[in-house]
Amino acid sequence: MSILHSFNKDTICAVATAPGVGGIAVIRVSGADAFRLVSPLFLYRGKAIDLSGAKPRTALYGEIMEADELIDEVILTCFHGPHSFTAEHTVEIACHGSIYIRRRILEALINQGCRLAQPGEFTRRAYLNGRMDLSSAEAVADIIASESKAQHQMAMKQLRGGYSEELNALREELLRLTGLMELELDFPEEDVEFADRTELLALCDQIELKLKKLIDSYRLGNAVKRGIPVAIVGTTNVGKSTLLNTLLGEERAIVSDIHGTTRDTIEDTMHIGGYLFRFVDTAGLRETEDTIESLGIERSRSKIKEADIILAVVDGTRISEANQLDYIKSIWDEREERTLILLVNKSESLAEADRIGLSETLQTKLSTPTKPIFISAREGRGIDELKGELTQIMETSGANEADLIVSNARHHQLLREAFDALRRMRLGFDMGLSTDLLTLDLRHAITSIGEITGREITSDDTLHYIFAHFCIGK
């Protein structure tokens, strides 16, 4: 039996609101028999009614009863398929948020013949019933999990179909390219070149560029989705842990005058300017014979490589120490595409002339026109300027642009597969391989892109993997 039909037989039910005690909970019922199974449990103005005749999308105040037991007073709303989230008949029951009440209503529904929904089953049905494509369905999970404005905006773009439109356009271009090449296979006896080779390669190049742009956006998209990784680095005792505590507004890291106090990385997140940042306080890098501290330093090096933004902290009162400047210079030289913000800490005791001199020294040492930010992590000075700089970095990164950003690891992998298939086709073209072999790679690229939106999905295992990560009531 086709996966499009085997999963949609039962009428399912689940709590659609978050677990725990609350003022209100919503229980969702969906399936062909939703109205028939809920009707015996619901009394409207003291009488049982046939919910199939209820006015769609109209709230009804009544009672949920089972075997003469009043379970709760509820607000019930009916949605007639296909005009519902799942495109099936749907009933939503808003009850009091008691754990007992939720459980009793679910028990009553199951006694009537409903089945408890699996994780993501409502959204899965919406996809299988054509209410949304697969990438939009995955966006639902991202919207639910979003913690910041940027995460929410990125997921909403995907849900509203812009992402799917871009992918479908790419797929159509690939189909056109394949069609032009396969014409020669259909008419081998004709000594005619159906497609100009130069035009074919130009079209292939255009598609590759579009794919690469989407692939390259994944680093930013993944960072926004999971929290932009920011490493706080510097030699020992420059105030890295104090800076983390000040940013977070709590004593997250131990602060001490003893060198090497931070022996492991400490991570925490906070929202700044609509973005979620994941700060990592690293152990101060220095030569040490302490085994535990050495392990912490190695982990710090790893976290620095993973970071998208580096906060390089120096102690403004000890700037003459060569190891401070040498260490920051090494980080600067190895930063690659990462953004580095230079922070001069303990600046509360520095005169204006000293600040100017320090700024010039650091700019000369790093061969950069970028000026450092002077802060006092202990007193909170300069922290607002730092937060503004972090926000500005993200604003100019493209995170808020209209361009689509890939944030889903599955999508990224499939886009890479499509890109690699096109590269193989291009290489085979240059080697003079036959048209039938070239079109195999094109078909692979088409399938990979189609799997993102669900147009090429044939495996139930793939759908199970995707929707198993949803919560029960979605």
From Swiss-Prot:
Coiled coil: none annotated. Its cofactor is K(+). GO terms for cellular component: cytosol. Residues 227-395 form the TrmE-type G domain. One of its GO terms (molecular function) is GTP binding. PROSITE patterns: G_TRME. One of its GO terms (biological process) is tRNA methylation. (6S)-5-formyl-5,6,7,8-tetrahydrofolate binds at R28, E92, R131, K474. Binds 1 potassium ion per subunit. Mg(2+) binds at S241, T262. It is found in: Cytoplasm. It holds the Pfam family MMR_HSR1. K(+) binds at N237, S256, I258, T261. Its EC number is 3.6.-.-. InterPro entries: G_TrmE, GTP-bd, GTP-bd_TrmE_N, GTPase_MnmE, MnmE_dom2, MnmE_helical, P-loop_NTPase, Small_GTP-bd. Homodimer. Heterotetramer of two MnmE and two MnmG subunits. Exhibits a very high intrinsic GTPase hydrolysis rate. Involved in the addition of a carboxymethylaminomethyl (cmnm) group at the wobble position (U34) of certain tRNAs, forming tRNA-cmnm(5)s(2)U34. Belongs to the TRAFAC class TrmE-Era-EngA-EngB-Septin-like GTPase superfamily. TrmE GTPase family. This is tRNA modification GTPase MnmE. The lineage of its organism: Bacteria, Pseudomonadati, Bacteroidota, Bacteroidia, Bacteroidales.
